[in-house]
């Protein structure tokens, strides 16, 4: 089920438009640094929100709340600390890199030495 509010949000193309349509104030310096991170986090929050049975005003309020929550995450933190995107999660200095598969050279040469 779709709502006019969600349809309108899906058609937006800039972070500023989301804030304008949902009538939320924002600091340009926060948005300049974290616009994609904020929208990605908003999408994560929206994905866990049920809109079933809500009228369009309630959907708009829920969308506004998720954008406000996502914005707050980055107004009080940084994209590096939040690690919303996969590339940042994979290169977390706090987490050791995953070890690749190791095959000893003897195991590779073993079939050759049995001829």
Swiss-Prot record:
Biological process per Gene Ontology, one example term: nitrogen fixation
Coiled coil: none
Glycosyltransferase listed as a keyword: no
Entry keyword set: Nitrogen fixation
InterPro entries per record: NifW
Annotated family: Belongs to the NifW family.
Quaternary context: Homotrimer; associates with NifD.
Function (record text): May protect the nitrogenase Fe-Mo protein from oxidative damage.
Protein name: Nitrogenase-stabilizing/protective protein NifW
This protein's encoding gene: nifW
